[in-house]
Amino acid sequence: YLLEELHKEGHTPEAIQEALRAMPMHPAMIRGVRSLQSHHHGTDFLLLSNSNEVYIHTILPSKGLAEPPLFTEIVTNPAHWEPNGLLRLRRRISPDGPQHACKVGCSANMCKGDELDAFKQRHADRKYERIVYVGDGGNDFCPVKRLGPNDVAFVRRNRGLARRILQEGGVQCTVRYWTGAWEAEQLLNLLCPPSP
């Protein structure tokens, strides 16, 4: 795999983490979620990613998204550094345990729809009025299909999720399309305007 190749080539954990920290994240996306957090204190944020813990816990602080804490929960694949410097990834759903029964096309390691449902169940006392889901990959189709009529999906144009919605349909929620992060920021501000 790629991580094993990087390790064989002598790339250190520090070099990999530095590359992760250098990855760009548009300031408008950061402003959009921070504005939502500061003006709507009852908002919960779930980071639902098919990435891994090491990547996420390296990137978030470098973009100012770790403190004050933004995410109520982060659901992703476990990962850790081996003593020899190899980044070891594990599947969120172990290949040795019970598997998900998703028929929408989620990857074997995680059904994002099941994970979203489990999050809502864990926080059932919150009685969410609306879920706003921001996604772009084809693996975001399953949770978007589970959203209801009061929910909104912010879908990045010309990506896997937009293609699946167009080709397969079956979505009950409102879909708002965006291309650049500034559009996502505008949509967030329109949907949840900052309090005066």
Each predicted region: which residue ranges?
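C-terminal cap/substrate-recognition subdomain and adjoining C-terminal extension
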Residues: 30-34, 38-46, 51-196
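A metal-dependent, Asp-based hydrolase signature
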Residues: 1-44
